[in-house]
């Protein structure tokens, strides 16, 4: 069975669960391919495709798997550093408006920060500034390394939050699904 998924989804969600699937179904040989392209089932040797979206693909059967919230996350070091260095002029990260003094990390294909800031009723933060990444896993790694605050999808940040590699500076989430 060949499964095509987005790279970040493979790294952050699917691969950590693959071992349990293999234990339950040892007779199924699984091949994971990562791609950001739409799959052409007539040409590509793929059995299942998992993509992020609304699931409306003409001529294909699709299932809605789960909702994802957008959640601001950063390194615990960045959050502690902002607090401990405040007396030396470092930017605090106590309120959403404090994001204007921090680097925002972006997914280059989506404008999630603008949506999240609107949902949080926050003005005065430039939602377009900061580096953008072509892959969510790279963006989240930048956040883990203390390079800024990322807006992560809940399914992709779950394990990093549990392991303490990422923290939520704010409890406000946004679900962009219609």
Residue ranges of predicted features:
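Central regulatory/effector-binding core of bacterial HTH transcription factors
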Residues: 1-58
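C-terminal regulatory
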Residues: 41-43, 55-177
